[in-house]
Design a protein with these regions (language model features):
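Short aromatic-enriched loop/helix-cap "lid" or pocket-rim segments at secondary-structure transitions
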Residues: 1-3, 64-67, 91-94
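Short, surface-exposed alpha-helical segments at coil->helix boundaries
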Residues: 2, 63, 120-124
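Glycine/small-residue-rich pyrophosphate-binding loop that anchors the diphosphate of NDP-sugar donors
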Residues: 22, 117-118
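Short aromatic/basic micro-patch
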Residues: 25, 59, 120-121, 134
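Amphipathic terminal alpha-helices
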Residues: 121-128, 132-153
Length: 153
């Protein structure tokens, strides 16, 4: 997500087709709270460990991430949307010329593919056991910005 923040704030981010692609994610502090909650409640006392999926519920869409970043940064950005074929063509072209010179660039083919695929994870264990989230997406970003302001420049 830190790369997404940088891309949005530097106006290097583009939607690839569907704005509503779900991207599972969770704030690190929320993950720590959830682990502590699972250990404290010991809902499965007979088990030595509990394995669970962790994500916000529901997983935010890529558009919700971008809007939350803009909100927390107090900036209103227009984020263009391009068909994936155009972005892939650009990315492959940039990669072709940049790779021999070992130049880093923000148009990674792998990252574009990641934006297209939904990785919507349902935190079933937490839902079934009524876990109460401490942070919304915007609250998580605000807290992150407060703790790490350099990542929001």
């Amino acid at each position: 997500v830190s790369r997404l923040i940088k891309a949005v704030l530097n106006r290097c981010f583009f939607y690839v087709g569907n704005h509503n692609t779900r991207k599972a994610g969770v704030y690190v502090k929320e993950l720590c709270y959830a682990i502590g909650w699972v250990m404290e409640t010991k809902l499965n006392k007979d088990k030595r460990f509990i394995l669970f999926n962790m994500s916000m519920n529901p997983s935010p869409s890529i558009q919700e991430y971008v809007e939350a970043i803009s909100n927390v940064a107090n900036k209103n950005f227009f984020v263009p949307s391009f068909p994936k074929i155009i972005l892939f063509a650009c990315a492959y072209t940039i990669e072709f010329f940049a790779k021999p010179f070992r130049l880093n660039h923000p148009f990674s083919i792998v990252r574009i593919r990641k934006l297209i695929k939904s990785n919507n994870i349902l935190p079933t264990y937490l839902i079934k056991n009524s876990y109460q989230y401490k942070y919304s997406l915007i609250e998580a970003f605000k807290d992150w910005k407060k703790d790490c302001p350099d990542e929001w420049k």
